Amino acid sequence: MQHDLFEHDPAIRQLIGHIDNIPAPELESRWPRSVVDLIDVLENELKRQNVSNPRELARKQAVALSCFLGGRQFYIPCGDTILTALRDDLLYCQFNGRNMEELRRQYRLSQPQIYQIIARQRKLHTRRHQPDLFSPETPK
């Protein structure tokens, strides 16, 4: 992953930096509805994280994304798979060996489902902290 995606295009960097000089309503009224919707989503997440100037940052992020992905067909999968992976990791972190029933009720899963999740997560967490000695790949 590049740290400065637009380092070779100073014009884009300059334009993204100039966004703050244009009144938001004027700017957003000229953008496609899908970009404004993306700004709303990004702004809400930035607010949730207590980031200052969330709307301004969200606009800059949306412009950066549209410069990078604009004009391409780009598939963003439904959040279900991502949310399930996050839920499974959280469940594993909450599991203490004695709270199976509590987790079963909280996540509305069966006991066998929870055991399967814990087994999968244990493997993932072990690999995260103890790299495979026989694997040719080096951890990143």
Curated annotation (Swiss-Prot):
SUPFAM superfamilies: Homeodomain-like
CC cofactor: Mg(2+)
List of residues binding Mg(2+): 26, 37, 40
Subcellular location(s) per record: Host cytoplasm
Keywords: Activator, DNA-binding, Host cytoplasm, Magnesium, Metal-binding, Transcription, Transcription regulation
Variant or mutagenesis effect after changing residue 90 to S: No effect on dimerization and DNA binding. Complete loss of dimerization and DNA-binding
Record note on what altering residue 40 to N does: Loss of DNA-binding activity and transactivation. No effect on dimerization
DNA-binding region as annotated in the record: 99-119
Co-factor remark: Binding magnesium induces a conformational change that allows DNA-binding.
Impact when changing residue 26 to Q: Almost no effect on DNA-binding. No effect on transactivation and dimerization
Phenotype for residue 115 to D: Loss of DNA-binding activity
Single GO cellular component term: host cell cytoplasm
A GO molecular-function annotation: metal ion binding
Chief localization: host cell
Outcome reported for the amino acid change (mutating residue 113 to P): Loss of DNA-binding activity
Induction and repression of expression: Expressed in the intermediate phase of the viral replicative cycle.
Membrane-crossing segments per the record: none
Residue stretches making up the bZIP domain: 69-90
Family the UniProt entry places it in: Belongs to the c/mor transcriptional regulatory family.
Self-association state and partner proteins as the record states: Homodimer.
Role: Positive regulator of viral late genes transcription. Responsible for the transition from middle to late gene expression. Activates the Plys, PI, PP and Pmom late promoters thereby allowing the expression of viral endolysin and structural genes. Activates Pmom promoter by unwinding the DNA, thus realigning the promoter elements and recruiting the RNAP.
Domain remark from Swiss-Prot or TrEMBL: The helix-turn-helix (HTH) motif is involved in DNA-binding. The leucine zipper (bZIP) domain is involved in dimerization.
Protein name (record): Late transcription activator C
Source organism of this protein record: Escherichia phage Mu
Gene that encodes the chain: C
